[in-house]
Amino acid sequence: REVSHFKGKITYWDVINETVILPVFNKYDNAVSRICARYGRMTLIKEVFAAAKAADPEAQLLINDFNTTDKYEKVIEECLQAGVPIDAIGIQSHQHQGYWGAKKIKEVIERFSRFGLPVHFTENTLLSGMLMPPEIEDLNDYQVKSWDTVPFMEIRQQEDLAEMYGILLNSPYVKAATYWDFADGAWLNAPSGLVRVDGTPKPAYDRLKSIVESRYAAK
């Protein structure tokens, strides 16, 4: 329905999200997990991609996941072998437990570039406050009443953001990068936004604005 309604207006669609865990995921009861349990992951993926392609043959269709291990690579391989019309690979990079660092970012890009498809960093977050404990496996399980931004971590956030976007924007394989939270508290109540709760910009906002303007502003 949505793809048909916005045909010709929206180019890129995240067709299906987080399929790596779907075969065993039963934490939340919803239509997607029930359908996957009944018919299998690949059947579900093939059906939703076919429906999206039929609704808008010119749209660019993404598969997307937070899992950047070889399990995601295997899912992509199976999809391509089955003829699923994937146009780009989505990578989530919610870094609530700490910045990935340049080495991991480059390694992830290199591994997923082997498919010959554009790589999109679809959900990127960097914190300017206390990090989530490393033992948390599902980020949604971490629920706190107060999660404040901290001045010295705001500096760290903008430094990490600058390094990360420098890598992404200069990679021939990465074609898009989306910052997930504009304001603090938008997801998990985390201080992961570019602006604070009161709407004032953090150093990361100014840094990203400068990066974008210097690269894309009309000459």
Where are these regions (language model features)?
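Distinct, well-ordered alpha-helical segments
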Residues: 24-28, 68-83, 101-109
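Aromatic-rich peripheral "rim/lid" segments of glycoside hydrolase catalytic domains that contact
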Residues: 5-8, 14, 19-42, 47, ...
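Surface-exposed cleft-lining segments at the edges of enzyme active sites
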Residues: 31-37, 61-63, 91-99
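Substrate-binding cleft/loops of secretory-pathway carbohydrate-active enzymes
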Residues: 62-92, 130-136, 185-187
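Active-site beta-loop-alpha junctions enriched in small/polar residues
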Residues: 15-18, 64-68, 91-96, 124-127, ...
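Active-site lining segments of carbohydrate-active enzymes
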Residues: 47-62
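Structural preference for beta-strand elements that scaffold enzyme active sites
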Residues: 10-14, 58-62, 85-90, 118-121, ...
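Short, acidic/polar
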Residues: 1-3, 69-79, 158-167
